[in-house]
């Protein structure tokens, strides 16, 4: 089965997420099972961020300080360009999506970059891999604090379906479920970091299993609350268009700005891939902490769709970069936004 899935155009983990959504739709947790699923999801989120804390190396982030301009551009793309585009899209087309889906788009826009796929695609494209590792690591370290703050600020300005910023209760949850476990992981990294790295494959299963549990709990609550009547095929198509437009805009802007600022081809590749990624692994648990439980299932839909889009688009773009490594593309060339 795994070999079969590997040949499909859809990411294997996305297939597992969709299967989890289907299970939640058919067999949602309710009655006594609902609080049990919620408690298990809470523990899973804390475990995820503890493991993130153990894995992320502050030294790796600081090691790339000499690439200051590169890191600044990645940071601005991740935490300024994306949010600006998302807010502009919502302001121009407020009725294109439901308030919950727009809240999900804004959350997507303020998430940190990914580490694994950013580095992997940079490597495939023959880019600056050490700088990619530093930039993506720094993005995740900063995102632990900055993402909730930006989400609260931007969602409070647009009245996205009542998602008006972060409540005091949500602040407490952020501290208990995200910051404290992450800080504990960072503190214990010198002692258990090596063990975690050696057992990365096994703990990767724990990571993904925890995320699937969070998704099951979120979608179960959405089913019980009856929120899914607002989503039909036409709405999903519009969401796809919004996500594709966001990704295409960021890929194009980061490419053109990198070239006009005189970055090398290797650094351009790093900026494009690190600056256009959004972390599914961070976003799903963060959404469960930041938003009312019944709406989380809808709010994470934009992120789940964007994750698949970014993998397909960046796989095609990485192959294009690798094929043309000896001759830089002219500044006027367009960047493919999808595979």
Labelled PLM ranges:
Residues 1-93, 152, 156-265, 325, ...:
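Structural signature of multi-pass alpha-helical membrane transport proteins
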Residues 15, 77-85, 110-115, 131-154, ...:
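Membrane-embedded alpha-helical segments of transport systems
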Residues 63, 116-128, 229, 256-259, ...:
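Helix-loop junctions at the membrane interface of multi-pass solute transporters
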Residues 68-75, 96-110, 127-137, 236-240, ...:
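The feature identifies polytopic integral membrane transport proteins across all domains of life
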Residues 90-146, 151, 155, 160-170:
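Membrane-interface helix-loop-helix junctions at boundaries between adjacent transmembrane segments
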Residues 112, 244, 248-250, 267, ...:
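Hydrophobic alpha-helical segments embedded in the membrane of multi-pass proteins
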Residues 200-206, 263-279, 285-286:
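Helix-helix packing/entry segments at the starts of transmembrane helices
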Residues 280-339:
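C-terminal transmembrane helix pair
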């Amino acid at each position: 089965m795994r070999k079969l899935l590997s040949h499909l155009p859809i990411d294997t983990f996305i297939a597992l997420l969709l299967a989890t959504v289907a299970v939640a739709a058919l067999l949602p947790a309710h009655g006594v099972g609902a609080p049990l699923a919620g408690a298990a999801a809470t523990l899973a989120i804390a475990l995820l961020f503890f493991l993130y804390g153990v894995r992320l190396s502050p030294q790796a982030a600081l090691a790339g300080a000499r690439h200051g301009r590169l890191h600044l551009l990645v940071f601005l793309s991740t935490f300024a360009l994306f949010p600006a585009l998302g807010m502009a899209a919502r302001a121009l087309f407020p009725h294109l999506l439901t308030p919950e889906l727009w809240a999900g788009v804004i959350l997507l826009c303020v998430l940190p970059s990914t580490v694994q796929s950013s580095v992997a695609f940079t490597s495939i494209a023959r880019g600056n891999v050490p700088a990619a590792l530093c930039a993506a690591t720094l993005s995740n370290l900063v995102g632990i604090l900055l993402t909730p703050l930006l989400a609260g600020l931007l969602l409070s300005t647009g009245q996205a379906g009542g998602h008006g910023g972060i409540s005091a209760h949500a602040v407490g949850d952020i501290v208990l479920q995200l910051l404290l476990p992450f800080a504990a992981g960072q503190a214990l990294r010198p002692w258990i970091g090596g063990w975690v790295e050696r057992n990365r494959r096994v703990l990767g299963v724990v990571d993904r299993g925890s995320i699937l549990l969070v998704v099951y709990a979120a979608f179960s609550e959405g089913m019980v609350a009856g929120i899914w009547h607002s989503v039909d095929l036409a709405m999903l198509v519009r969401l796809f268009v919004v996500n594709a437009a966001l990704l295409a805009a960021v890929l194009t802007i980061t490419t053109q700005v990198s070239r006009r600022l005189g970055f090398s081809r290797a650094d351009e590749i790093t900026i494009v891939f690190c600056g256009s990624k959004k972390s599914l692994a961070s976003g799903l648990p963060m959404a469960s902490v930041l938003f009312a439980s019944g709406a989380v299932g809808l709010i994470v839909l934009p992120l789940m769709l964007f994750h698949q889009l970014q993998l397909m688009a960046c796989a095609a773009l990485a192959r294009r970069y690798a094929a043309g490594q000896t001759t830089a593309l002219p500044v006027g060339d367009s960047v493919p936004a999808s595979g």
